[in-house]
Amino acid sequence: MDHHQYHHHDQYQHQMMTSTNNNSYNTIVTTQPPPTTTTMDSTTATTMIMDDEKKLMTTMSTRPQEPRNCPRCNSSNTKFCYYNNYSLAQPRYLCKSCRRYWTEGGSLRNVPVGGGSRKNKKLPFPNSSTSSSTKNLPDLNPPFVFTSSASSSNPSKTHQNNNDLSLSFSSPMQDKRAQGHYGHFSEQVVTGGQNCLFQAPMGMIQFRQEYDHEHPKKNLGFSLDRNEEEIGNHDNFVVNEEGSKMMYPYGDHEDRQQHHHVRHDDGNKKREGGSSNELWSGIILGGDSGGPTW
């Protein structure tokens, strides 16, 4: 190549470079290689997961299929159940003969299948609170106590129709005598009419025909103690007298007998012509009126 041709080639290259620089559409694209990033963390994690899954599959596929003998009863009737606590190092087996679990590399479980040890629990003893509560129950059958409110509050109204031969008797003493011999009943006599009201049942009252014929008066002279039981049978009625304290006026036995005969005759007269109030009051107050009983 001579000097003229070299110069011409040099001009041609210069023109080509100026034309490319003046053209706005002609761009020079320079591609740079991407930066190198380290992706070792994600790849190692995925590879480790895959390795674990492979190990699990290989371990489960390579587990012993032959039956293991039970360490308790040495029976071959056993089966593989699962891995203890999801650990591949301790597989769990079940003995079908003695129904016990055991783990390879662990200890034999004495608890049978289904929790049989819970069935042998003793029943709890009854609490002391329940037994004490039964002992402290209230009494549903309290003792029946009679009270004589009407006679104690106003005894004069109760005995206004009672013709007593002995004026030394007081009404409270007569109430006590009537309660002592007729079973501690409470009476309530409505005076002024023909009505008589009893608050006690008639089955608790025991009558006798002639009460004052054999029962002397009290508080008339001196006292004598007598403990005896008199049983008088008349028309299937029984009267018991126990521990009564009697007062005699003078100590003369003949005077007392005469006094009783007078009262007995007076009672017969009242029985013939007396009113029903006197009759009932004689029954309630110990037979002072001398009237009959039935």
Swiss-Prot record:
<keyword id="KW-0238">DNA-binding</keyword>
<feature type="zinc finger region" description="Dof-type">
    <location>
        <begin position="68"/>
        <end position="122"/>
    </location>
</feature>
<feature type="region of interest" description="Disordered">
    <location>
        <begin position="247"/>
        <end position="294"/>
    </location>
</feature>
<dbReference type="InterPro" id="IPR045174">
    <property type="entry name" value="Dof"/>
</dbReference>
<protein>
    <recommendedName>
        <fullName>Dof zinc finger protein DOF4.1</fullName>
    </recommendedName>
</protein>
<keyword id="KW-0479">Metal-binding</keyword>
<feature type="binding site">
    <location>
        <position position="95"/>
    </location>
    <ligand>
        <name>Zn(2+)</name>
    </ligand>
</feature>
<feature type="compositionally biased region" description="Polar residues">
    <location>
        <begin position="126"/>
        <end position="136"/>
    </location>
</feature>
<keyword id="KW-0804">Transcription</keyword>
<keyword id="KW-0863">Zinc-finger</keyword>
<feature type="compositionally biased region" description="Gly residues">
    <location>
        <begin position="284"/>
        <end position="294"/>
    </location>
</feature>
<comment type="function">
    <text>Transcription factor that binds specifically to a 5'-AA[AG]G-3' consensus core sequence.</text>
</comment>
<feature type="compositionally biased region" description="Polar residues">
    <location>
        <begin position="157"/>
        <end position="173"/>
    </location>
</feature>
<keyword id="KW-0539">Nucleus</keyword>
<dbReference type="GO" id="GO:0008270">
    <property type="term" value="F:zinc ion binding"/>
</dbReference>
<feature type="region of interest" description="Disordered">
    <location>
        <begin position="109"/>
        <end position="178"/>
    </location>
</feature>
<keyword id="KW-0805">Transcription regulation</keyword>
<feature type="binding site">
    <location>
        <position position="98"/>
    </location>
    <ligand>
        <name>Zn(2+)</name>
    </ligand>
</feature>
<feature type="binding site">
    <location>
        <position position="70"/>
    </location>
    <ligand>
        <name>Zn(2+)</name>
    </ligand>
</feature>
<feature type="binding site">
    <location>
        <position position="73"/>
    </location>
    <ligand>
        <name>Zn(2+)</name>
    </ligand>
</feature>
<dbReference type="GO" id="GO:0003700">
    <property type="term" value="F:DNA-binding transcription factor activity"/>
</dbReference>
<dbReference type="Pfam" id="PF02701">
    <property type="entry name" value="Zn_ribbon_Dof"/>
</dbReference>
<feature type="compositionally biased region" description="Basic and acidic residues">
    <location>
        <begin position="251"/>
        <end position="273"/>
    </location>
</feature>
<keyword id="KW-0862">Zinc</keyword>
<dbReference type="GO" id="GO:0000976">
    <property type="term" value="F:transcription cis-regulatory region binding"/>
</dbReference>
<dbReference type="GO" id="GO:0005634">
    <property type="term" value="C:nucleus"/>
</dbReference>
<dbReference type="InterPro" id="IPR003851">
    <property type="entry name" value="Znf_Dof"/>
</dbReference>
